[in-house]
Amino acid sequence: MEFYTPNIVRVSKTLESGNVNLRKSLAVVLEPTQVEVNVSRQNDMVKASSSLLEVILDLNTGRVQFSNLDGSKLLTEKDYGVQLMPLQYVQRIREKKVESHVAGEVVPTQSAPGQNTPGLDRGKMRTIVENTYEVSQSFILDEDEVIYGLGQQQTGKMNQRNQRLVLEQNNMQIAVPYFASVKGYGLYWDNYSITTFDDTPMGTSFRSEAGEAIDYYFLYGGNGDATVALLRQLSGQAPMVPLWTLGFWLLAV
């Protein structure tokens, strides 16, 4: 667990012991700031408190719980709710040769399996092996808690409870692994592989096909506007389009 700000906490979990350096995020631009955190331990419970947020880690089950300073629970992980299943992805690619436009030297390039580009010599096949994990984390939300987000989904629903959504980019379907709760917090799941969001009476989970670790950010703003501001602080501020462009857009293909 790491406090990036007094109300933004990063949670990472791996199967490795000791300090593990994860890859630099492609989406998160915020760097950790100097945050005063009070840490205490009672038996298997470790509590870390900033000026705005309290986080409790159960060393026995690995469960993380987020609360505000008056003790009201915001979000709780499910007991033993983390899964990291080792996987190995194998891809065969063909190296082809093409003349450089700069100096005329021959340089190797890569193409997808079965791709046949005219004018290029067929090269040798090469195998790429990547060891990774299928990663999953489950949470417990209040029964009547409403959450928004997860991108542009064609379900006709605003509240994303009681749904199973596959988060991948498709025409008219934009996936964003982030949801915001009416309780004033947001959760950003930092993973770029195909991810399944699943909410049932048994729990709420993100499951990604590939990842080196469980990696997510908890943001507590207290209300929707403040939480969106924290997300912009975390991932960068996208400029608004000019006022004259707002209105009805139509693209006919």
What is the meaning of each model-derived region?
Residues 41-253:
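Catalytic and substrate-binding clefts that recognize carbohydrates or anionic sugar/phosphate headgroups
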